[in-house]
């Protein structure tokens, strides 16, 4: 049975993630950073309690692991500074360019997929980008679906013209999809002001 603290963490995860993530680019520049909790307390006048409840939530979107850290007074300004100083990144790669990547077989078992950090298996089939860097098919397809460049060398994949326009018009929208072990899935968060936790749903 989940403890009161675990339930509280789950609630904070769903409520702050939509407000913290601002766009697809930030999600990729900081792939393990999902969000941090607001400095709120139940009575509104106890600053010590509010500070003690501040948490930073780290998520690996590929392994679906989550770590909750207690925040510090210096972390909040640092993270907000990263948000404000970010530069626009490249839009998602076109579906045609992703589908066109060849499937190759790994000769040996040395090395790893730099996205999920899993080691290659002997005779495993992977996808190879035009820059010759190789990744698990599922990993690189997810990556390029958010950001159209190689995660190793930043080789730029072709993008759709309408995706560029859509990105400029929908700069405040972020789509996130991952699941926790309890069967709940957080997805399709909108970073518009006034967003709520409607993106949390139960899986059957």
Curated annotation (Swiss-Prot):
Subcellular location: Cytoplasm
Catalytic function, reaction form: S-ubiquitinyl-[E2 ubiquitin-conjugating enzyme]-L-cysteine + [acceptor protein]-L-lysine = [E2 ubiquitin-conjugating enzyme]-L-cysteine + N(6)-ubiquitinyl-[acceptor protein]-L-lysine
UniProt-recorded Gene Ontology molecular function terms: misfolded protein binding; ubiquitin protein ligase activity; zinc ion binding
Superkingdom of origin organism: Eukaryota
Enzyme class per UniProt: transferase
Keyword set, alphabetical order: Cytoplasm, Metal-binding, Stress response, Transferase, Ubl conjugation, Ubl conjugation pathway, Zinc, Zinc-finger
Inducing stimuli: Induced by arsenite and the proline toxic analog azetidine-2-carboxylate.
Keyword check for Metal-binding: yes
Maturation and modification: Autoubiquitinated.
Pfam families referenced in this protein's UniProt entry, alphabetically: zf-RING_2
UniProt xrefs under SUPFAM superfamilies: RING/U-box (SSF57850)
Disulfide bond entries: none
The enzyme's E.C. designation: 2.3.2.27
Transferase as UniProt keyword: yes
Chain positions of all zinc fingers (RING-type): 113-154
GO BP terms: cellular response to hypoxia; cellular response to misfolded protein; cytoplasm protein quality control by the ubiquitin-proteasome system; protein autoubiquitination; protein polyubiquitination; regulation of protein complex stability
GO cellular component, one term: cytoplasm
Job description of the protein: E3 ubiquitin-protein ligase involved in protein quality control (PQC) under proteotoxic stress. Is essential to plant survival under proteotoxic stress. Functions by removing damaged proteins before they form cytotoxic aggregates. Recognizes misfolded proteins selectively and tethers polyubiquitin chains to the proteins directly for subsequent degradation by the 26S proteasome pathway. Targets misfolded proteins independently of cytoplasmic chaperones. Associates with the 26S proteasome and sustains the structural integrity of the proteasome complex at the initial stage of proteotoxic stress.
Protein name: E3 ubiquitin-protein ligase MPSR1
Protein's organism: Arabidopsis thaliana
């Amino acid at each position: 049975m989940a403890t009161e603290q675990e339930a509280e963490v789950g609630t904070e995860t769903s409520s702050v993630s939509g407000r913290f993530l601002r766009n697809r680019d930030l999600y990729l520049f900081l792939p393990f950073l999902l969000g941090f909790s607001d400095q709120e307390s139940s009575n509104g006048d106890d600053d010590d309690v509010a500070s003690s409840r501040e948490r930073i939530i780290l998520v690996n979107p590929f392994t679906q692991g989550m770590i909750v850290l207690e925040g510090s007074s210096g972390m909040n300004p640092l993270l907000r500074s990263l948000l404000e100083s970010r530069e626009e990144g490249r839009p998602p790669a076109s579906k045609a360019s992703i589908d066109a990547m060849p499937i190759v077989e790994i000769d040996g078992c040395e090395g790893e997929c730099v996205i999920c950090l899993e080691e290659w298996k002997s005779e495993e089939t992977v996808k190879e980008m035009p820059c010759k860097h190789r990744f698990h098919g599922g990993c690189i397809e997810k990556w390029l679906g958010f950001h159209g460049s190689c995660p190793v060398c930043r080789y730029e994949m072709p993008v759709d013209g309408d995706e560029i326009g859509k990105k400029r018009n929908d700069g405040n929208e972020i789509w996130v999809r991952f699941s926790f072990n309890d069967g709940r899935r957080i997805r399709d968060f909108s970073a518009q002001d006034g967003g709520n936790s409607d993106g949390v749903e139960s899986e059957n």
